[in-house]
Amino acid sequence: MFSKEESTSLRKEFWTCFGKSFPRKWVLYNTKIKGLSFKFVANRKNAMICLDIEHSDEMVNKILFDKISSLKTILKEDYVSEVIFDDSYRLENEKIIHRIYINHKDKFSIYNKNTWNSCYNFYVEVMPKFELFFLEYKDIINCI
């Protein structure tokens, strides 16, 4: 196992290497829709790309999730076929959110540098497709 300091250092190195290797401005938190954000996730067990719905008003969360869910067929057929819709995703801190995500299929651990390149390639291949879907359907999603 790694000490807390080693763990922190490896995480920082992972994200720094990603940013330097693939300098690009991602949408991420800049969706311009309150409570809706894209995220790259990497931890000791897996990596994924997420669209998280975490508005302070649960009714808004449900509406946003339902609107994106109504576009599920388009998202799967035209952008990212492996997408998973979860209306009650439990985060590590036990918070329940609505999450739409794509898992990295290869074995991955943020603590194993040999798995990093595969994850980076997954991120740069899949996130642009996910973002493109969002940007093309943003007006429908944001119609609250």
Feature map (PLM): residue ranges:
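Charged, terminal alpha-helix-loop-beta segments
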Residues: 1-144
